[in-house]
């Protein structure tokens, strides 16, 4: 069975989704729906299970138990079809610095089997959408971190996915670059009716970008809801930091900067 019984508003459905590594349970029987057209945030400290969950939903990591449906397709029964319907940007920068922006997009277009007669125009459109027209023929090693992130978003949208998965999309970026990425994500949701599921440590990112939020703690779903309503449920003056402390008993940990990207690039290549 490749199709789940979903109503038209649900694009991602997780049912008791679990992943173990030996005796350690990284994601513990998580059940959650994401509706069509949402920008949905997964918030949690390091080790909460956010990246493991994303890797299961993008079929890069099989679940130990449970099931999930993405764009109506089972991640267990038909992972190849899931990959055709989604875009994915890993946490660490995955673009090839020794290629130009345009060459990176051409590589991705081939990887995602974009029809040959459509590749040139889709690349032009994606570069324009991400405001990278003037940098298209420069080597990516000379791009800023924010430009690389926008290039990776362009790569992920080339095959017109219905769902976009982003793992810490603005980690390590300065405030101006972060807001540029947020603007592009809002435009992608508006212009293409795209559903976005992103992981984050950043409370400001959630407040500015996410329609709905799920907080993960030790691999379990602590709470889910609209960010402003979660705050009001704690107190009239509560912030998302207060919500996190209430459900998880501590302050969220911020992750560091970029590390070696080779493994993340190899992970991205396996999406093809």
Residue spans for each PLM region:
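Conserved ABC ATPase "signature" region
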Residues: 106, 110, 117-135
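Conserved catalytic motifs of ABC-family nucleotide-binding domains
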Residues: 160
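Catalytic Walker B motif of ABC-type/P-loop ATPase nucleotide-binding domains
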Residues: 164-167
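Helical segment within the ABC ATPase nucleotide-binding domain
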Residues: 179-192
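A short, surface-exposed alpha-helical micro-motif characterized by mixed small hydrophobic
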Residues: 206-208
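ABC ATPase "signature
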Residues: 224-225
């Amino acid at each position: 069975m490749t199709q789940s019984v979903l109503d038209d508003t649900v694009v991602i459905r997780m049912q008791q989704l679990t992943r173990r590594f030996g005796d350690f349970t990284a994601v513990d029987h998580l059940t959650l729906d994401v509706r069509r057209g949402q920008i949905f945030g997964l918030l949690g400290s390091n080790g909460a299970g956010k990246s493991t969950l994303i890797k299961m939903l993008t079929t890069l990591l099989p679940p130990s138990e449970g099931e999930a449906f993405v764009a109506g397709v089972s991640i267990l029964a038909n992972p190849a079809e899931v990959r055709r319907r989604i875009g994915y940007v890993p946490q660490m920068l995955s673009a090839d610095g020794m290629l130009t922006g345009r060459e990176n997009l051409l590589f991705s277009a081939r990887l995602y089997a974009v029809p040959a007669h459509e590749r040139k125009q889709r690349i032009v459109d994606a570069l324009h959408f991400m405001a990278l027209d003037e940098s298209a023929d420069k080597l990516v090693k000379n791009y800023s971190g924010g430009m690389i992130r926008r290039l990776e978003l362009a790569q992920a949208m080339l095959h017109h996915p219905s769902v976009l998965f982003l793992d810490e999309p603005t980690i390590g970026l300065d405030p101006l670059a972060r807001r540029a990425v947020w603007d592009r994500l809002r435009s992608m949701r508006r212009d293409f009716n795209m559903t976005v599921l992103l992981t984050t440590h950043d409370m400001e990112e959630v407040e500015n970008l996410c329609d709905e939020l799920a907080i993960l703690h030790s691999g379990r779903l602590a709470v889910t809801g609209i960010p402003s309503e979660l705050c009001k449920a704690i107190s009239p003056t509560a912030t998302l930091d207060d919500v996190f402390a209430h459900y998880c008993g501590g302050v969220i940990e911020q992750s560091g900067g970029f590390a070696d990207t080779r493994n993340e690039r190899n992970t991205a290549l396996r999406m093809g």
